[in-house]
A protein has these predicted regions:
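Glycine-enriched, solvent-exposed interface loops adjoining structured elements
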Residues: 1-249
Length: 249
């Protein structure tokens, strides 16, 4: 017999919810069942953002730095930045160079005496705001007064000068997209589907009457599925650690 020749298996929202309910010993019956499962999925995605680096959510971005401006807005769905450089001579095959820019804490940034001094940026403070949208009339001071969006920001130091052009090139972790409607597929790779289904089943068992007896096994299955998925979803390049040597003369 021949194999199917296909390798495009995936499940949409309704199918995963149905599978999760079955693991709880229940059936998907009402619109509310669907709605509460979708809510649990979005909470599950938020939990995954706290568990570490999800490789499929890494995206590259670029910000053109302007002379005299040291604070810039990141995309609103940014979780964090994992790498960043300052690029000079962008687009020039001969002169383009990516230079190190060091991440600093708010404490370190606060102690910089002159935050307006200009030069090539060598340090960046990443202000990880919530990304929430507030009514513009009651928006807090740290949100955009026009849009009401409390977007994440970067602040570089020194403030960019006009001696050359600078770009802030970064690699960010973005939020996993929401569950959406019943016909949507998920913003996760196929290898995460078993973990996604196991996690949703566990979350639903916390809410379904009569599913309490299944909680221990569902929690165990979710933990095991997450361990397998997280172990596979990682950077696999070789690493080399070299001790730092400091000399005092």
């Amino acid at each position: 017999m021949t194999t199917s020749g296909l390798s495009d298996f995936n499940l949409d929202l309704s199918e995963i919810i149905e599978e999760a309910f079955e693991r709880c010993g229940a059936e998907l019956r009402t619109g509310y069942d669907h709605r509460t499962a979708r809510r649990s999925l979005n909470l599950l995605f938020a939990d995954w953002a706290n568990r570490g680096i999800n490789m499929w959510t890494i995206e590259q971005g670029t910000i053109n730095l302007v002379q005299g401006t040291n604070t810039y807005v990141l995309p609103v769905d940014t979780v964090d930045l994992i790498e960043h450089v300052v690029r000079t001579g962008a687009g020039n095959q001969t002169t383009q160079a990516d230079l190190t820019i060091t991440r600093i804490s708010v404490d370190t940034y606060a102690t910089i005496p002159n935050k307006l001094s200009q030069g090539r940026p060598i340090q960046v403070w990443i202000n990880r705001q919530s990304g929430a949208t507030y009514p513009t009339a009651t928006a807090p001071s740290y949100a955009n007064s026009t849009t009401g969006v409390d977007a994440p920001q970067i602040t570089v130091w020194p403030t960019p000068d006009g001696s050359q052009s600078y770009q802030f090139v970064y690699w960010r972790l973005r939020r996993i997209q929401d569950a959406g409607t019943g016909v949507n597929t998920f913003d996760v790779p196929f290898r995460m589907i078993p973990c996604l289904t196991a996690g949703l089943a566990y979350y639903l068992a916390l809410k379904i009457n009569g599913a309490e007896a299944r909680l221990p096994i569902l929690k165990q299955q979710y933990d095991e599925a997450w361990e397998l998925a997280a172990t596979e979803d990682r950077e696999k390049a070789a690493q080399r650690f070299v001790p730092r040597r400091m000399f005092i003369t």
